[in-house]
């Protein structure tokens, strides 16, 4: 089954320096994490702090969700971390 992203929530994790968001596959919730470096790479004007990274995520949500779906289809795991190389 394909992933869906019905929950627009996202949050910044300062300990892991990433933005966290969730996808759904049927009744399963799958957590995803996008590294700060990846967000700064796809949004060059992003600042590497919480407001800047959340804004970069919001501006590139469709692109990030597409990458998440592509990675999920290849490998099924409990959670996923997206790096710069994953978001094309």
Model-flagged regions — what are they?
Residues 1-23:
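Short, charged/polar N-terminal "headpieces" of proteins
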């Amino acid at each position: 089954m394909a992933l869906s992203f019905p929950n627009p929530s996202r949050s910044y994790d300062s300990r892991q320096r990433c933005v966290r968001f969730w996808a759904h596959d049927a009744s399963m919730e799958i957590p995803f994490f996008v590294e700060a470096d990846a967000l700064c790479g796809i949004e060059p004007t992003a600042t590497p702090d919480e407001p800047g990274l959340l804004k970069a995520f919001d501006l590139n949500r469709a692109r990030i969700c597409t990458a998440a779906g592509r990675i999920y289809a290849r490998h099924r795991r409990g959670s996923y971390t997206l790096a710069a190389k994953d978001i094309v």
